[in-house]
Amino acid sequence: MQMEEDRFPTTVADYCSEFDIPLKDLKLKCVFCRFYLTEQQLAAFYIKNLKLVWKNRYCFACCTPCLRLTAKFEAENYFQCMCKGEVLEVLTRIPLSSLSVRCFDCLTLLSFAEKIDCIISGQNFYLVRGRWRSYCRNCIEK
């Protein structure tokens, strides 16, 4: 079954294209709570460039509250290390502009400017489950 599911679209954009459904008409359930995502949550999922999950030929996304809980759970259970931004490029051997960093709280993909802001403001970067995280412009103020 997994092999067959590997052929299904993994992004919202690919899903809409593959099944010829406008984003505004798309209805997907959350993989965790099974409630339908609101239009705003689906748009946020799309903008964050997160991957869809296929289970038994059904497609799921993740609602905003469950996404935040997932980020918290992963940070509490899969934290590996943290470092200051000044050493991140040396540590990873990847230019900051190419390094994928998601928000520690909401899993938004940080822009290059947000990564620079994290460094300037002295924020830490955290390695969680093999992926780097820090804070996006919306969560850093909370």
Swiss-Prot record:
Record's keyword annotation contains Transport: no
Swiss-Prot/TrEMBL GO biological process terms: DNA-templated transcription; regulation of DNA-templated transcription; symbiont-mediated perturbation of host apoptosis; symbiont-mediated perturbation of host ubiquitin-like protein modification; symbiont-mediated suppression of host innate immune response; symbiont-mediated suppression of host type I interferon-mediated signaling pathway
GO molecular function annotations of the record: DNA binding; zinc ion binding
Annotated InterPro entries: E6 (IPR001334), E6_sf (IPR038575)
Zinc finger (unnamed): 30-66, 103-139
Statement: the UniProt record of this protein carries the keyword Ubl conjugation: no
Keywords, ordered alphabetically: Activator, DNA-binding, Early protein, Host cytoplasm, Host nucleus, Host-virus interaction, Inhibition of host innate immune response by virus, Metal-binding, Modulation of host cell apoptosis by virus, Transcription, Transcription regulation, Viral immunoevasion, Zinc, Zinc-finger
Subcellular compartments: Host cytoplasm; Host nucleus
Any Pfam family hit: E6
Assembly: Forms homodimers. Interacts with ubiquitin-protein ligase UBE3A/E6-AP; this interaction stimulates UBE3A ubiquitin activity. Interacts with host BAK1.
The family this protein is said to belong to: Belongs to the papillomaviridae E6 protein family.
Function field: Plays a major role in the induction and maintenance of cellular transformation. E6 associates with host UBE3A/E6-AP ubiquitin-protein ligase and modulates its activity. Protects host keratinocytes from apoptosis by mediating the degradation of host BAK1. May also inhibit host immune response.
Listed name of the protein: Protein E6
Natural source organism: Human papillomavirus type 60
Underlying gene: E6
